């Protein structure tokens, strides 16, 4: 029997944080101050845990990893310390724990001493048929009390955690610092990116969420540089360098030398995820959003997915896809590149078994493919986590009559090995860490063999919104 989902209320979180600072039983040296911890790059047999220290006077402490919450029968995993100075802490260190040889489809717990208890929790995936839930959303940079603050401490993160997803896909605007500065020397801007991340991960509700839910994080403009930042932004190299050391991620096939896009590919069960970078290679003058190298990579990966006959492909594209040609939002200014991708998807007969997960627009809206003239696949816009409402793009076939702050979505997959059922569902935070499904944003695909079919959804008679109504 599987164990119940990991839960840690606020008071216990503060208690555990205090215990986290303990250095008894050989865990940490006196004066060390662990600040944050998050997990990513999860597979069926491995994961990566990163821990940030304001300073680390002794050697990197080993991580205790166990399948038990009390860390009994734990194995010891040594960490690799990487100097990562920030604007506010010259002695800041990030310790990477590369966890390998894990059992598939198993829940793991980690901490630094037996007395500290569980500080991180994740579940490995499985190869072959595997049922899971992935939550996805974007745009978190405000609170109810301070709407224009740079970071979020909203309880929307508690609401997502309550659904117990296997992974959270953050599609950009992790914060709204809109950093800018001289490109060289690199260190000052890198330090500012790291200080921004430290502030995000010091927010109570986000900190707790990322300790129990692995992340897949792709930046957008406000957390990559200033508003509408692209390849020409002086922040590009600093953002790329800090991402490599401070963010848990899957292999970066185009960025091995810290100079390419942070494009990633991974599988959860029989679902193939392709994550594209919409900022670091965007060149408006050349009318390319992906850049030549990333565009070629995506064409190749789409072909590989078709050849591998994966039942479902999830393309994480951080910006709106369904926009009018020439529209300044999302793909509108890159219509030729978008059309070429649409033709490739159509020629591979992938349209029925591809879903796009998108952010940037501060709205919750799905399209069943009827308004997607470039590929005809399902598109799911999800957000804002904690930001003002600002719709973009469209029309969309499935959209609520009103938009609110505190919105996110889930991709729930049930896979029998013969039939894979994928359900996209929008959710809205009600406050106090509770959420409700938004009935207008629900789509379900039934996939078997090389085809997926849309199932009757609510509302079945959803009509497209009038064209030309987006800002």
PLM features: what roles do these ranges have?
Residues 4-471:
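Metal-dependent phosphoester/phosphodiester hydrolase catalytic core
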């Amino acid at each position: 029997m599987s164990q119940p989902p990991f839960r840690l209320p606020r008071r216990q979180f503060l208690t555990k944080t205090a215990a986290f600072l303990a250095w008894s039983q050989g865990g940490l040296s006196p004066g060390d101050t662990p600040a944050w911890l998050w997990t990513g790059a999860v597979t069926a047999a491995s994961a990566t845990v990163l821990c940030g220290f304001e300073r680390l006077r002794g050697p990197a402490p080993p991580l205790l990893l166990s399948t038990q919450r009390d860390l009994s029968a734990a194995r010891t995993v040594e960490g690799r310390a990487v100097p990562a100075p920030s604007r506010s802490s010259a002695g800041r260190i990030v310790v990477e724990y590369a966890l390998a040889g894990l059992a598939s489809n198993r829940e793991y717990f980690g901490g630094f001493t037996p007395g500290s208890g569980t500080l991180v929790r994740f579940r490995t995936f499985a190869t072959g048929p595997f049922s899971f839930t992935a939550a996805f959303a974007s745009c978190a940079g405000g609170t109810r009390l301070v709407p224009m603050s740079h970071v979020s401490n909203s309880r929307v993160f508690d609401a997502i955690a309550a659904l117990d997803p296997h992974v959270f896909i953050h599609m950009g605007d992790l914060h709204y610092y809109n950093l800018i500065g001289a490109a060289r020397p690199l260190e000052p801007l890198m330090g500012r990116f790291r200080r921004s991340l430290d502030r995000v991960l010091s927010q109570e509700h986000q900190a707790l969420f990322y300790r129990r839910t692995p992340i897949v994080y792709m930046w957008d403009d406000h957390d990559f540089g200033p508003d509408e930042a692209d390849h020409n932004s002086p922040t590009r190299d600093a953002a790329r360098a800090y991402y490599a050391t401070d963010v848990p991620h899957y292999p970066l096939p185009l960025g091995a030398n810290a100079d390419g896009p942070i494009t990633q590919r991974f599988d959860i069960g029989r679902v193939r995820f392709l994550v594209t970078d919409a900022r670091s290679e965007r060149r408006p003058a050349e009318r390319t959003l992906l850049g030549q190298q990333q565009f070629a990579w995506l064409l190749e990966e789409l072909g590989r997915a078709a050849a591998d006959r994966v039942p479902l492909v999830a393309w994480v594209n951080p910006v709106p896809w369904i926009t009018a040609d020439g529209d300044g939002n999302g793909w509108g200014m890159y219509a030729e590149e978008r059309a070429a991708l649409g033709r490739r998807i159509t020629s591979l007969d992938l349209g029925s078994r591809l879903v796009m997960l998108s952010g940037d627009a501060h709205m919750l809206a799905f399209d069943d493919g009827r308004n997607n003239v470039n590929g005809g696949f399902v598109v799911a816009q999800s957000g804002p986590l904690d930001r003002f409402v600002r719709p973009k793009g469209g029309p969309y076939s499935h959209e609520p009559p009103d938009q609110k702050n505190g919105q996110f979505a889930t991709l729930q997959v049930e896979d029998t090995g013969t039939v894979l059922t994928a359900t996209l569902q929008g959710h809205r935070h009600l406050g106090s860490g509770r959420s409700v499904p938004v009935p207008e944003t629900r789509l379900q695909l039934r996939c078997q063999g090389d085809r997926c079919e849309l199932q009757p959804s609510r509302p079945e008679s959803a009509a497209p919104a009038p064209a030309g109504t987006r800002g």
